[in-house]
């Protein structure tokens, strides 16, 4: 019987799930919006909310707890420096899951997982800067 079983297995081992959510969290922190399947997005949203709550605490223990989950130092740095300040007046509900249709290959339901009050002008800014640097390096 499946009584009191809280999370989806997503057809993965525990270590694979843990690594996948760590990578998804790092991507969500970097881009502030990711496209994934609906079940993954629904599982990821509460995990990301907990990470933002840790960032709002801002102390060393919270930073180490976040680093143990995300395992990406630049993502944790952005989490604490940017999101901790951005969401200091908001009590929970830091993520939004928006259904986005179905994937053509296998008809899997797709969703957009995004941070509320995200900086829309920053979308793709890091990619544009990296691309410009690559072009400059190729020319010079």
Swiss-Prot record:
Record GO terms (molecular function): structural constituent of ribosome
The family this protein is said to belong to: Belongs to the bacterial ribosomal protein bL17 family.
InterPro entries: Ribosomal_bL17, Ribosomal_bL17_sf
GO terms, biological process: translation
Name by which UniProt lists this protein: Large ribosomal subunit protein bL17
HAMAP family the record matches: Ribosomal_bL17 (MF_01368)
Disulfide links within the chain: none
UniProt xrefs under Pfam families: Ribosomal_L17
Subunit structure: Part of the 50S ribosomal subunit. Contacts protein L32.
Top-level taxon of the source organism: Bacteria
GO CC terms in record: cytosolic large ribosomal subunit
Alphabetized UniProt keyword annotations: Ribonucleoprotein, Ribosomal protein
């Amino acid at each position: 019987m499946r009584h009191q079983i809280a999370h989806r297995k997503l057809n993965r081992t525990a270590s694979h799930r843990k690594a996948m959510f760590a990578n998804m969290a790092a991507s969500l922190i970097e881009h502030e919006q990711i496209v994934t399947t609906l079940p993954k997005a629904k599982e990821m949203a509460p995990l990301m909310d907990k990470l933002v709550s840790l960032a709002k605490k801002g102390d060393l223990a919270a930073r180490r707890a976040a680093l143990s989950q995300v395992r990406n130092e630049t993502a944790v740095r952005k989490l604490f420096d940017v999101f901790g300040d951005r969401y200091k007046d908001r009590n929970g509900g830091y993520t939004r899951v928006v259904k986005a249709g179905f994937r053509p290959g296998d008809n899997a339901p797709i969703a957009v997982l995004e941070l509320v009050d995200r900086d829309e002008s920053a979308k793709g800014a890091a990619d544009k800067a990296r691309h410009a640097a690559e072009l400059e390096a190729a020319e010079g």
